């Protein structure tokens, strides 16, 4: 087996945990955004002793988190280069891509022009057209849908267009065909959504249930990522949480679904107990979905503290030749205006038991530096973007 600096690299993306406005925040209407800083203020101090040990407060002062005199990890921050601040853009950039055209989000629903085209091409009416929880919108509009056959169209804070239909009203093959039409229409730059999702359900009013026949029509990454290179070289790429959806299954050797952040940490612990060579890639989405978009700083703070409390289990299972990297994909400051993501730096923590000490890493000008470091470690084809910091980890 080749002599890799690290046999296993565990990447943990704390979805939306930004660490202060990016230099180009003004272009995104995000001046003053500071996800971690503002949560810490609202909580009157965050209790994250394990992240403190890793050096989190050395990146930026955070209320309640002391700057440990001798941090155990290398620490720094990364700036997003791509033109966007959504989950797909952040993750694709982490794995070596540069995204010029941002994916669209529709916090006020989709434009009439798009929906009229969809109606015309499907022969069905449309109801809903707003951001909503998938179960709540069925309670609200399921009965009307059953009477009229109109499609329930809704979105979320992410770049998605979801179409819900009762399996006895709109047969599955028709719903899938409708979603394929929607996918085609939204390849137009002005409607460019990351995913179309078919959301079939069954049951009666008051007792609707979504079925397992969900189908995603995602965009595949437009170029090869570091994950493709690892997989082609026979290495393991273990996706945990929504990672597989984000990359539309590209470059992934196995995928573990998660129900929550804590379930994600359980799956990470399980993965730490297995023998593999390659990467494990975990996304913890609750920070973003449950607290950031809902502008709930206290809930967000508690979730951060719960995450921190799970880290000793991870530390205990790390081997000498493992590397743990903790970062984020964008910000989502819960005290910022609106409900959207925020353009921020993201933290970068790199920890291994074999590190002699720790030090500050230079600020990365692109998230792709992380992907380049992974590629460098596994001696595979380097991405077009990004500069490896592997040699700095000693």
From Swiss-Prot:
Task: Tell me which EC number(s) this protein carries.
Answer: 5.4.2.7
Keyword Manganese attached:
yes
Please name the GO terms of the biological process aspect recorded for this protein, alphabetically.
Answer: 2-deoxyribose 1-phosphate catabolic process; 5-phosphoribose 1-diphosphate biosynthetic process; metabolic compound salvage; nucleotide metabolic process
Record-level Gene Ontology MF annotations:
magnesium ion binding; manganese ion binding; phosphopentomutase activity
Write out the catalysed reaction.
2-deoxy-alpha-D-ribose 1-phosphate = 2-deoxy-D-ribose 5-phosphate; alpha-D-ribose 1-phosphate = D-ribose 5-phosphate
Cell compartments where the protein resides: Cytoplasm
Q: Which residues bind Mn(2+) 2?
A: 288, 293, 341
From the record, give the cysteines joined by S-S bonds: none
Positions binding Mn(2+) 1 in this chain are 15, 329-330
Kindly give the Pfam families that the UniProt entry links to this protein. Metalloenzyme
Pathway where it operates: Carbohydrate degradation; 2-deoxy-D-ribose 1-phosphate degradation; D-glyceraldehyde 3-phosphate and acetaldehyde from 2-deoxy-alpha-D-ribose 1-phosphate: step 1/2
Q: How is the cofactor bound?
A: Binds 2 manganese ions.
**Main subcellular localisation:** cytoplasm
**Ribosomal protein in keyword set:** no
The cofactors named for this UniProt entry are:
Mn(2+)
HAMAP family attached to this UniProt entry: Phosphopentomut
Give the record's family classification.
Belongs to the phosphopentomutase family.
Job description of the protein: Isomerase that catalyzes the conversion of deoxy-ribose 1-phosphate (dRib-1-P) and ribose 1-phosphate (Rib-1-P) to deoxy-ribose 5-phosphate (dRib-5-P) and ribose 5-phosphate (Rib-5-P), respectively.
Protein name in UniProt: Phosphopentomutase
- Biological source species: Bacillus pumilus (strain SAFR-032)
The organism's lineage is: Bacteria, Bacillati, Bacillota, Bacilli, Bacillales
**Quick one: which gene encodes this?**
deoB
